[in-house]
C-alpha cells in the first residue's frame, strides 16, 4: 500500500515508523529538513521537503496513485486543504487532523466527505473519551465499548482481593460463563491465554463481557470497595483537558490547575459551568494541592505537555491518597516505566490516532481498531462478509495463527461471547485480539 503522510510532528513521525515496519510504501512530507532528519535511518521510508498544500510537492510525491493520504500537521487549515488537493489529484482515501469539535458532527463530516476528505480525526477528542472511560470506572485501567456496550472490554489490574487467581482459565471461564479473559500482561510479557493459563497477582487482565455482567466482573476481581469518582483534579489546561472536562458527567466536580494566568482566564470564559473550578498555580506544588483538597480527591489527571511531569505528579497524588490517576504520556519510551510505577490509565494521543488511522489500511470491513498500549496487542472489530473464511467453520477449526483469539461478537445488536464451537455468521461484528501478528494476516479470514 502506498501512503503519504503530511507533517513530521509527533503523530506523523509515529505513524511513519509504525507503518514502515509493516512494509508499507511510505512518503513523509514536511517543510523542515531538521524534523525529517529526526526520524532516523532505521525506518524504511522516503522523506520529502515541501509544503503539503503545494500541487507540485504532492505530484512529486506521487499522490496520483496513492492509496492513503494522511495530513497530521499542527495546522488544521493545512490538513484540510492538502487532503482536498490530494483527493482531487488521485489519492484513493484521505485523513485530516482537525482541532474544531464542530467538524466532528455527523453533518460536518458528510460535508467534508463531499469535498474529498474520507475521515476527520481529532486526537484530543479521542483521548477525552478514554480519559472519561477511565474516570467513570475507577477500578478499571482501560475500557472499550463495542456497539454502545453490547460488548465491553475491561483492562483490570489484579490485586490480593481477586477471587480467580491461580486457577486454570478453563476451570473459571467456560463457554457458559459471562466473561472471557482475552489477553494478559504479566511484567513485560503479553499472553493470549489458553485454557491452561492462570491469572496471577498483579497481572493486567483484559476481560471481554457484556454490560449486564460488569458488576459481576467487579466482584470476582475484588474491586467492589473502590469508590466511584465524583471529584477530579486536572493538572494542565490544554486542549485535551478542555475536551475531557466538557465530556465529564455533571455529577463529577472538577478542578483544573494551570500555571499560565492567561490560559486560566481563557478557561474561565469557555468552561462556564458550576461543577468546574479553574485554579491558577503549579500542579506540582504540594501545599497548593493540599489546600485544594487533594487528600479527599478521588481522581487526579495529569495532562501537561511533559510526560515526566505527568508521571511524577500522578505518583505524588497516589502518595497523598488519590486512588485513581490518569497520565498523558506522549513519549512512547516512558509508557512501560509508567506501567511499572503503577500509574493507572495512560493516555497517548499518538497511539490513539494511529489505531484510528490504521483501520483505513485494511481491505476487510473494520469498524474499530484499538492498540492496547499496556499489553502491546491490537484489538479489532471485523464485520464477517458473506462466504468469508471465518463463516465456513466453527471457531476452533478456523486455524487462526498463534497469538490470535476471538473474544466476542455482536449479532443483531446483541453481544455474545465466543467459544470454540461458535459458528460466526455473515454480518456478525467480531472482536479479534492479536499479539505480534500483523492485522493484514487476520483480515483475510473476513473478506
Task: List each model region and its residues.
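Cytosolic regulatory regions of ion transport systems
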Residues: 1-447
